[in-house]
Amino acid sequence: MAPFRGRGGFRGGARGASMSRGRRGAARGGAKRGGFAAARTADQVEESNTQFRQAPESEHSQPESSDESASEAEDDEDSEDAQPASAIYATLLQSMSARKTPFGGTVVDPPHVSHRKKRKLHHHVPGPEEVPGAALMPEEGHAHPRGDDQGSETNGPASGGEDHEEEGEAEDLDEEEEQQRLDNTEDSPFDAHFANPDENELAVRLKRITDNQWITKKLDVGRGRGVLQVPAADEIALSRRKVRSTRDVVLKARLVDNAQKVLGNFDDTEQAIAPSIFDYQDLLFGARTVQNAGRLRDIICLHALNHILMTRDRVIKNNAKLAAATDDVDAEYRDQGFTRPKILFLLETKQACVRLLDSITKLHDFEQQENKKRFLESFSLPEDKFSDEKPADFRELFEGNDENEFRIGVKLTRKTLKLYSTFYNSDIILASALGLRRAIESGDPKKRDSDFLSSIEMVIMEQADATLMQNWEHAEFVFEHLNLQPKDPHDCDFSRVRSWYLDDQARHIRQTIVLSAYLTPKINTLYNKYMRNVAGRLKYTQDYTTGLIETLSYGIKQTFLRFDSPSHLTDPDARFKYFNTSILPSISRLPKTPEGGPGVLVFIPSYLDFVRVRNSLVDSDFSYASISEYTDTTDVRKARSHFMNGKHSLLLYTGRAHHFHRYNIRGVKRVVFYGVPENPRFYDEILGFVGKTVERGEVSRAEAGVRVCFSRWERLELERIVGSKRIVRMIADKGDVFDFV
């Protein structure tokens, strides 16, 4: 296997390879609150490929909990239904080529799969400790004991496919709520998209997705702009309904009051994206901020909860119909996937899990929350680590528990929220991309299991911009493993599996929601490759008409220098050549002042470029220091001190070092941006270093300056800084020098 790139091998972007903030032990006996209060812990993950403890196999075990089988009324006399699930699965695969699909052709159901009344059979459910290959996360290179904080975060066995019910749940649905449920969900987006899609229209849209044929509509909405695409032939498919509040959304009765209380009316931006969210379209939202993050989280959690409840209640209703049907009545209800998990949240930190579960419990009243204390002790720490001097986006991401290797299953019943459920018995999976990859790749390579992702119907990536600063390959790995055909049956009742699952079209039915503070080429690639939903997709970006530069008030000259770069692939070479031939010679000509050295900070967004520049300076006459995400605390302190005192003329500083630490560097008189930072806040903060030096009188405003090297391949990054009204001229103009003050 090729080595993992990024921060320290597998970890990718850990917060400083040798400078992790805190240890796992800090979480033990942590804050114990009545609610999902914010808190924080972190640990340094081993950067080697640590082997995970494997649970022993066993032929005899008890079900995970007694409530799993309580609602499974069975009749063991029905020998036809007593066929092993593995036999059904094998026969189904052999006959798959004959199934009737939206594109034509026929499929003959396996002869032993009856269309008559189905009775669920008791299935043996091994506990997590009996699961072959169940990977448990290590702590400091050692396997956790069975009762630790991550013991159940494993992809354990399925329990009779999608067994959604606890004992007596169906009876708990009183007549009034049952009627309201039926009224609310009739002709709902859930019904049209998942439960009963029009087969002819589905076939047309799948064909257009294959041919990459989308009709497009531009939307000027909120404080941004959107592009709506639908794989349909008729322009009417681009029409959108108005969603001004939660009252305009088809919700389960038990969510209505809390939704109105928590969310109420939507603002302009929320009204722009709400139709896409609640109508199951894909959404790429490139305008996430600290201010709107909480509302976005609540909206998405409401949608996810509603989806789970609709799915479960549909299964309950069909179970009742099957139980009441007589043997001479043909009844087929396709209302399930291969496995139970339906929602996947890709989060950046454990504290983000705490915030997300806080949203869920605000929107749904649970009588009981199992393993809540254990969860808070492992995932939560007080959010008061940093002072207000740190930027708000930094504090939102890293305050509390900033550990970024985790995964946990969440099971929802009508009255209970159960944390630490095994993946195959979970409705929701909360995980970081790294944690999920570790779970899939652990153990014997021949027994790696990602089947628990086979029936994911909604995936949400909450902070794609933060994921970029870790290791984007982990996110790509997860998306590559979504909605694949399962390798094992997992006690699935294939007579209940929806046709589009069997036809391997689930990836085009799945809804994908990606939130980010800004968009980058990698995020756009994810959009083009994995967000191909038959319902359509919306890309929403901020309005960058004026750009960040018009809001800056430092009064410092900023010069943007365009260099020739004929190809995106050769751009790193062209940039390095330009830096060596144009930028370094100009730095060497700077006058030396009695107050210290020239104080030039070179900001390098890419670590690979940083290594290349640093190596090129080894044999030069420049006195320089360097700070990257891998530099240990002692060397960072020494580099900052020597640069501030003028002992070093240059300070090389990486974008990820700034992302993870937001150092306040003194002695900066001039800045060279080796490339345009993807995060526009970084430009403001680095420029602020020079502004503070001017305020302290260490350099005059005329002597201070900023130079930015850019090529035509950095259009997105440049637009966020200079604005869309200037970007065309700066990219295409004959001149290559552009000054701003």
Curated annotation (Swiss-Prot):
Biased composition (Acidic residues): 65-81, 163-178
GO biological process assignments: maturation of SSU-rRNA from tricistronic rRNA transcript (SSU-rRNA, 5.8S rRNA, LSU-rRNA)
InterPro entries linked to this entry: UTP25 (IPR010678), UTP25_C (IPR053939), UTP25_NTPase-like (IPR053940)
Region feature (Disordered): 1-197
GO cellular component terms given for this protein: nucleolus; small-subunit processome
Superkingdom of the source species: Eukaryota
GO molecular function, one term: rRNA binding
Compartments, as annotated in UniProt: Nucleus, Nucleolus
Complex formation: Component of the ribosomal small subunit (SSU) processome composed of at least 40 protein subunits and snoRNA U3.
Family to which this protein belongs: Belongs to the UTP25 family.
Protein name: U3 small nucleolar RNA-associated protein 25
Record organism: Leptosphaeria maculans (strain JN3 / isolate v23.1.3 / race Av1-4-5-6-7-8) (Blackleg fungus)
Source organism phylogeny: Eukaryota, Fungi, Dikarya, Ascomycota, Pezizomycotina
Gene: UTP25
